[in-house]
Amino acid sequence: GLEYWGARDLPFGVVGSVVKNRCLLIGDAACLANPLCYGGIGAAMLSGRRAVESIVEGRPERYSRWISKDRMFDPRFLDAHRIFSSWNDAEIIDAMHPFEKGYSVPRGVFAIFRRPKWARVYMGVFLAFRLGW
């Protein structure tokens, strides 16, 4: 029969160092999955490509610098994840209230002004949509 091996956590949030000696971490190994949607295939493919390019150029530090600066790995995603992962039902209802009739940039701006305590979440999600996550 089949054996159950369990599930594994999907790592996200950039690790301390993605380059060490002759080793470059990419994708899940570098914790590059998006913490809002857990998407990681695109990040893995793109980070693999960037890692190879930096190796071919003989400048692996460029790969590390790319990860620290690219908006794809913006710390606001992890910040938003940490906040909404701790929400209770009442907080979810409160945060989503401005979007009961749909989602749009004006509604997002309205939500930030009406519920500033959730502004970091709103901005993280907006950035994710803008970047195509």
Task: Report the location of each language-model feature.
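A generic structural signal for solvent-exposed, polar alpha-helical segments
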Residues: 44, 69-72, 83, 124, ...
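Active-site-proximal substrate-binding core of FAD-dependent oxidoreductases
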Residues: 14-17, 52-95
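C-terminal auxiliary extensions adjacent to catalytic cores
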Residues: 89-133
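Short, Lys/Arg-enriched charge-dense amphipathic segments
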Residues: 17-34, 78-107
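FAD/FMN-dependent oxidoreductases across multiple families
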Residues: 1-54, 61-67
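Context-gated lysine
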Residues: 20, 49, 59, 69, ...
